């Protein structure tokens, strides 16, 4: 199957974006995507993320910049810091890239982020998730489209193979760079791409297409499952708390899936299999006062007949005087202490940051400002007249 430029363009136009943001590495995938997308009468911004790992990374950045100048497209480059010690580079870099993309997207009314993932990427991701022992959500792989907090991300080339993309580039004389670090098998994805996939192709020459189809089936099944679970979760919840007596009426497998969904909906984080098993055991033998630390940030408690998410730190751990002193220094107005409320952060808390037109979830702001996860647990929410006016010790809202 050859790439249909008209189909790709029509798919992008279907979302009626105000602006198009392209993750542009200079490789063949993003170069083809840029070449096609530039034909749209929609403002386009190409973003190059410099990982500072390869000797030629600056040359690649210049290549991308010159290509954008040639087509009169806006170009933005962003340089990543060194990966924190002990973290996986692949996972860390992916989070950093997406955080920067979303930071740029916040500037526009209805942005659409385009990424150049293709069928072979999907097949590799399926294998990576299978090796990890992932469930349906993981095996679903890379989503074709995903709604973001502000805008969405679309992968128009996901149904096309790498060979088809390279063929399109050759046919249309599209210049692109080649990253020889893609051959380095110390990275798991490269090992799968360069050694495992070729072996599987001996069994099934169309293995990438087959695995991609399996990922799509898993995605469809997971979507159905999540809708059914969400409906059931609503019937056994009270605000953000889970009613234990209603939960334990259900089959064990449904209980475990609901525990995972409940925690993720309220924290945007996933429970590990071991934690789900421990929680499942606890709710079926409930004891008021039981608790488990999920991370440095969250705890889950049993209180009477409810499962409750709490935060390990409390206001007493930080001097209220310190918080008020910080607020006085940073807020350019008189403070009526009788109207000030200080509490822990909640998952849905939002803040209108530095003159923005509308508020953003704190999780998004923490990512944009690159506040380490380990530091976020210190956050205290300061309210006045039931409105968030500051997040101690990080920033003022409004």
From Swiss-Prot:
Keyword Mitochondrion: no
UniProt-listed Gene3D superfamilies: HUPs
Enzyme class: ligase
HAMAP family tied to this protein: tRNA_Ile_lys_synt (MF_01161)
Family to which the UniProt record says this protein belongs: Belongs to the tRNA(Ile)-lysidine synthase family.
Free-text note on domains in this protein's UniProt record: The N-terminal region contains the highly conserved SGGXDS motif, predicted to be a P-loop motif involved in ATP binding.
The protein's name in its UniProt record: tRNA(Ile)-lysidine synthase
Originating organism: Francisella tularensis subsp. tularensis (strain SCHU S4 / Schu 4)
């Amino acid at each position: 199957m050859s790439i249909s430029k008209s189909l790709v363009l029509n798919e992008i136009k279907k979302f009626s974006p105000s602006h198009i943001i392209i993750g542009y590495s200079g490789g063949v995938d993003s170069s083809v995507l840029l070449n096609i997308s530039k034909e749209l009468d929609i403002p386009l911004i190409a973003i190059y993320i410099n990982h500072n790992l390869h000797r030629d990374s600056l040359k690649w950045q210049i290549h991308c910049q010159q290509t954008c100048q040639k087509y009169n497209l806006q170009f933005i480059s962003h340089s990543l810091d060194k990966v924190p010690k002990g973290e996986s580079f692949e996972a860390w870099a992916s989070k950093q890239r997406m955080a920067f993309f979303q930071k740029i997207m916040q500037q526009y009314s209805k942005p659409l982020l385009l990424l150049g993932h293709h069928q072979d990427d999907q097949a590799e991701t399926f294998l990576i998730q299978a090796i990890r022992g992932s469930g349906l959500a993981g095996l679903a792989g890379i989503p074709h489209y995903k709604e973001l907090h502000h805008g969405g991300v679309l992968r128009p080339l996901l149904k096309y193979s790498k060979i088809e993309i390279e063929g399109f580039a050759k046919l249309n004389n599209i210049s692109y760079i080649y990253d020889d670090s893609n051959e380095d098998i110390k990275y798991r994805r490269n090992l799968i791409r360069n050694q495992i996939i070729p072996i599987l192709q001996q069994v099934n020459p169309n293995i990438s297409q087959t695995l991609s189809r399996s990922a799509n089936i898993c995605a469809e099944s997971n979507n159905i499952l999540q809708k059914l679970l969400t409906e059931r979760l609503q019937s056994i919840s009270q605000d953000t708390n889970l009613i234990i007596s209603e939960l334990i009426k259900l089959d064990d497998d449904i209980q475990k899936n609901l525990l995972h969904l409940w925690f993720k909906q309220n924290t945007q984080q996933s429970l590990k299999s071991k934690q789900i098993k421990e929680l499942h055991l606890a709710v079926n033998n409930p004891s008021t006062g039981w608790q488990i630390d999920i991370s440095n940030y969250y705890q889950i408690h049993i209180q009477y007949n409810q499962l409750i998410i709490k935060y390990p730190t409390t206001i007493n751990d930080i001097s209220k005087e310190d918080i008020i002193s910080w607020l006085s220094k940073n807020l350019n107005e008189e403070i009526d202490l009788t109207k000030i409320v200080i509490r822990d952060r909640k998952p849905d808390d939002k803040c209108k940051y530095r003159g923005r037109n509308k508020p953003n979830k704190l999780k998004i702001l923490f990512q944009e400002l690159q506040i380490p996860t380990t530091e976020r647990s210190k956050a205290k929410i300061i309210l006045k007249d039931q409105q968030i006016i500051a997040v101690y010790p990080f920033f003022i809202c409004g």
